[in-house]
Swiss-Prot record:
Full protein name: Transcription factor CP2-like protein 1
Family stated for the protein in its record: Belongs to the grh/CP2 family. CP2 subfamily.
Source lineage: Eukaryota, Metazoa, Chordata, Craniata, Vertebrata
Keyword flag tRNA processing: no
GO cellular component: nucleus
Region: SAM2-like domain, residue numbers: 261-365
Limits of the Grh/CP2 DB domain: 43-280
């Protein structure tokens, strides 16, 4: 393990300009130095990240570098700015926020990332995939590690000052290979860093720069042995064969990439109506509860995915139908793209359970309801005696009834359906009444729903 400086605490004694010259003095930059011109220099990315771990010598030319890491060992990532300080005036803020992630390099595993990480969580309860070593880190503020995102950490830092984050990766590459029999090749990961600046509201949401590199993680000291093995293999090759491979660099430069597609989707919902006076009560019409009939096997909801749905509409549909974990996976899919996918495609991408559920949701295969009932919201000014309504002497503005299809004969399911129908919170509904033959109101309970279903059948 080679570092440029033995004491990270001394970084603040040097300015960022001299530190950047150290980075540009690496062999990888020396090869490109003759080609640099003022125009090319202006196109340099605003930031640069350097992982202080040696690259493998067994990587062919024109292939991406590969870096071996030891499980649980702290590795330094240096956060650098490439431009002059004057170029950072457009940031309108002193700090930027960086998010470091460890993700899969294999596209096949990217499709099932959620299931893979959940399986790892169950096999390693209480552990994290990625941690930040705060005591060793320099120049970072407000480091955070979400308990729900085991493979990501985030923090703030000042591009005008020296900053280094020390990370620890706790999962090894062979934990995600098919069933292990010994001697398998571990799957490669990626270390990706996404940096954001503040928007006009002070939120770190405006993307500034992203870069990543390929890694493999071994058990403690395994990375050192693998690096030595690769070096010995290269020494046995002829000079002509060695020309086909990259030299091993003491540090790993993260290369620019697209930002990680982590998008927060907000579902538009109708505003909750304001109510005055007594708590809300909803009436179930007299004799308007009926068992399921073939003619009444209507769709449970009208929220079907249409071929004309845009990419944004498809993302919101996934979110509304409890497929939020696949929003990033289908980030570029329109409604037509999703509708064209077969059951086998979705099972392979999402796993058996979620794949079948997503296929049924896309194709509009709904569960046949156990009961169909009709409800109305009876407003205070429209409440008149039942006899007056029958005689025609009451208010002509009668309640409008809506059909509700119940998959479960429980009060909770009924309240949730009513709340969804009227675009209010279920907590706003205190009781639900069923209006009897003589106009009496009976509080609806689970027992009453079950008995009504039995007697109606």
């Amino acid at each position: 393990m080679l570092f440029w400086h033995t004491q990270p605490e001394h970084y603040n004694q040097h300015n960022s300009g001299s530190y950047l010259r150290d980075v540009l003095a690496l062999p990888i930059f020396k090869q490109e130095e003759p080609q640099l011109s003022p125009e090319n220099e202006a196109r340099l990315p605003p930031l640069q990240y350097v992982l202080c771990a040696a690259t493998s010598p067994a990587v062919k030319l024109h292939e991406e570098t590969l870096t071996y890491l030891n499980q649980g060992q702290s590795y330094e990532i240096r956060l650098l700015e490439n431009r002059k300080l004057g170029d950072f005036q457009d940031l309108n803020t002193k700090y930027v926020k960086s998010i470091i992630r460890v993700v899969f390099n294999d596209r096949r595993l990217q499709y099932t990332e959620h299931q893979q990480l959940e399986g790892w969580r169950w096999s390693r309860p209480g552990d994290r995939i990625l941690d930040i070593d705060i005591p060793l880190s320099v120049g970072i503020l407000d480091p955070r590690a979400s308990p729900t995102q085991l493979n990501a950490v985030e923090f703030l830092w000042d591009p005008a000052k020296r900053a280094s984050a020390f990370i620890q990766v706790h999962c090894i590459s062979t934990e995600f290979t098919p069933r292990k029999h010994g001697g398998e090749k571990g799957v490669p990961f990626r270390v990706q860093i996404d940096t954001f600046k503040q928007n006009e509201n002070g939120e770190y949401t405006e993307h500034l720069h992203s870069a990543s590199c390929q890694i493999k993680v071994f058990k403690p000291k395994g990375a050192d042995r693998k690096q030595e093995t690769d070096r010995e293999k290269m020494e046995k090759r002829t000079a002509q064969e060695k020309e086909k491979y990259q030299p091993s660099y003491e540090t790993t430069i993260l290369t620019e990439c697209s930002p990680w597609p982590d998008v927060a989707y907000q579902v538009n919902s109708a505003p909750s109506p304001s109510y005055n006076g007594s708590p809300n009560s909803f009436g179930l019409g007299e004799g308007n509860a009926s068992p399921t009939h073939p003619v009444e096997a209507l769709p449970v909801g009208s929220d079907h995915l249409l071929p004309s749905a845009s990419i944004q509409d498809a993302q919101q549909w996934l979110h509304r139908n409890r497929f939020s974990q696949f929003c990033r996976l289908f980030a570029s899919f329109s409604g037509a793209d999703l509708l064209k996918m077969s059951r086998d495609d979705l099972v392979q991408i999402c796993g058996p359970a979620d794949g079948i559920r997503l296929f049924n949701a896309i194709k509009g295969r709904n569960v046949r309801p156990k009961m169909t009932i009709y409800v109305c919201q009876e407003l205070e000014q429209n409440r008149v005696p039942l006899q007056q309504k029958r005689d025609g002497s009451g208010d002509s503005n009668l309640c409008v009834y809506h059909a509700i299809f119940l998959e479960e004969l429980t009060t909770l399911d009924l309240i949730e359906k009513i709340a969804n129908l009227y675009s209010i919170s279920p907590q706003h509904i205190h009781r639900v009444y069923r209006q009897g033959p003589t106009g009496i109101h009976v509080v609806v309970s689970n027992e009453l729903r079950a008995m009504t279903a039995t007697t109606s059948s």
